[in-house]
C-alpha cells in the first residue's frame, strides 16, 4: 500500500511541476479556421466545429463539436464529454467525442472553466460546482441545436471529470445517461489522499498549509501555483512545493508513473494542458475539501450509470466504490489488461462498442 501511495504522489507532483514554465449555430466556426492541435488521429469523414457558449456564471466555455455523417437529416442523440482533470479538449475528450460521432452521436468535447481555451479570469483553477455547471451548460448548448434531440442527451466523464459528470446527472434530469472512464473522485482524492491514506493529523496540516497560502496570495495579489495533492515524507513533513522532474523518464520509474509521463509529456503533449506545462493554483483544493462531489450519488437514479475501469488501474477503487453506493440502474465494466491511462487513448482497450450500446439503449 505504501508503495502505491508514494507512486501516485510522485505522479501528481510530477504532473503539477514539469515545465513550470444570433443562435447557437452563429457561435460555430469550422475547425480548420485555426491550426489544428488535436493530438489524436483525425477522421476526415467526421466534421468538427469550434464552438463557444456560456455557463450560468457567465464564463465562456470553448468546445469542439463533432458531427456524425448526415447529421442534418434528423434529430440526433448527443453526448457531452470532458476530462481528464487538467487536460484539454484536444486530448482524450476530443478523441472520445470524435469516436462517438462515428456511432451517430453529436458529441461535444469542452474545456472546463479556467482551463484550455475557456474563459475565467483566474487561470488554472477549479471548482466542483463550476466544473459540474459546465456539463449542464454544454447540455444547454446542445439542446438548442436544430439537429439535436434535447430529450436524448448523455454525458461522459474521463478521470477527474467523472465526478462532475455524475454530479451533474444527479441534479440535471436532462442528462439521460452518464458514463465514466478511469474515474477519480477529486473531492475525495484531494481531501483524503490516494486510497484515503491521510491521517487526521495530516489532514490538519494540509488545512493549515492551504489557509496560510491564502494569506500569501492575498498579500501578493497573485495566485501561486502548487501541487493540488500535497504529500508527506517519511518523517510526516508536508511536502507542498513542486518537485523538479527530468525531461526524460527515469530508468527506475514504475509503470503507473511511466503511463502518465508517456501520455502527457510524449504522445499526447499539448501546450494548454495543465497536467504538463504548468500547475493548478495552490489553494484550488479548498473548494474540493468543502464540497463533496458524490453527496447526491443516490439522486442520480433512475438515470443509468456506466462505470468503466481498467483491471490494473490504480484508480479502480473509485469506480468500484461508486458502483456500491449508486442505486440502480448501474453497471460496472472492468477492462481486462488495462491501466488507468489506457482508457485515455488506447483504441484497443477503450470499449467504444459498449459505450455506444449503453447510450443507444438509454437515449431513446
Place the predicted regions along the sequence by residue.
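The serine-hydrolase catalytic nucleophile loop
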Residues: 86-98, 112
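Alpha/beta-hydrolase-fold enzymes
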Residues: 167-259
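N-terminal cap/lid segment of alpha/beta-hydrolase-fold proteins
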Residues: 32-74
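Conserved alpha/beta-hydrolase
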Residues: 99-119
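Alpha/beta-hydrolase active-site loop
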Residues: 125-146
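Catalytic histidine-centered segment of alpha/beta-hydrolase-like enzymes
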Residues: 338-349
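Short beta-strand/loop motif that positions the catalytic acidic residue
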Residues: 300, 307-309
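Short beta-strand element of the alpha/beta-hydrolase
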Residues: 74-84
Amino acid at each position: 500500500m505504501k508503495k502505491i501511495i508514494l507512486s501516485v504522489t510522485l505522479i501528481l507532483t510530477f504532473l503539477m511541476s514539469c515545465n513550470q514554465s444570433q443562435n447557437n449555430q452563429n457561435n460555430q466556426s469550422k475547425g480548420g479556421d485555426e491550426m489544428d492541435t488535436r493530438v489524436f488521429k483525425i477522421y476526415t469523414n467526421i466534421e468538427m466545429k469550434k464552438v463557444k457558449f456560456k455557463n450560468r456564471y457567465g464564463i465562456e466555455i470553448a468546445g469542439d463539436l463533432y458531427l456524425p455523417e448526415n447529421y442534418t437529416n434528423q434529430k440526433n442523440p448527443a453526448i457531452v464529454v470532458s476530462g481528464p482533470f487538467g487536460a484539454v479538449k484536444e486530448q482524450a475528450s476530443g478523441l472520445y467525442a470524435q469516436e462517438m460521432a462515428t456511432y451517430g452521436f453529436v458529441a461535444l468535447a469542452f474545456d472546463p472553466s479556467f482551463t484550455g481555451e475557456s474563459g475565467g479570469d483566474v487561470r488554472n483553477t477549479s471548482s466542483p460546482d463550476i466544473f459540474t455547471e459546465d456539463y449542464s451548460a454544454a447540455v444547454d448548448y446542445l439542446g438548442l441545436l436544430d439537429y439535436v434531440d434535447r430529450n436524448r442527451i448523455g454525458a461522459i466523464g474521463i478521470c477527474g471529470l467523472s465526478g462532475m459528470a455524475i454530479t451533474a446527472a444527479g441534479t440535471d434530469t436532462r442528462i439521460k445517461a452518464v458514463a465514466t472512464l478511469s474515474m477519480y473522485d477529486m473531492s475525495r482524492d484531494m481531501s483524503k489522499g490516494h486510497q484515503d491514506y491521510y491521517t487526521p493529523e495530516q489532514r490538519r496540516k494540509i488545512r493549515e498549509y492551504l489557509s496560510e497560502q491564502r494569506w500569501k496570495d492575498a498579500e501578493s495579489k497573485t495566485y501561486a501555483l502548487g501541487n493540488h495533492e500535497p504529500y508527506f515524507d517519511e518523517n510526516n513533513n508536508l511536502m507542498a512545493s513542486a518537485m523538479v522532474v527530468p525531461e526524460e523518464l527515469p530508468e527506475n520509474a514504475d509503470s503507473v508513473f511511466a503511463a502518465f509521463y508517456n501520455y502527457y509529456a510524449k504522445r499526447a503533449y499539448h501546450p494548454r494542458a495543465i497536467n504538463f506545462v504548468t500547475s493548478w493554483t495552490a489553494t484550488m483544493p479548498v473548494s474540493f475539501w468543502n464540497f463533496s462531489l458524490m453527496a447526491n450519488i443516490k439522486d442520480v437514479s433512475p438515470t443509468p450509470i456506466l462505470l468503466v475501469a481498467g483491471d490494473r488501474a490504480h484508480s479502480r477503487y473509485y469506480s468500484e466504490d461508486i458502483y456500491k453506493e449508486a442505486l440502480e440502474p448501474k453497471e460496472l465494466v472492468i477492462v481486462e489488461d488495462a491501466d488507468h491511462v489506457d482508457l485515455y487513448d488506447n483504441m484497443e482497450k477503450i470499449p467504444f462498442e459498449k459505450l455506444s450500446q449503453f447510450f443507444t439503449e438509454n437515449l431513446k
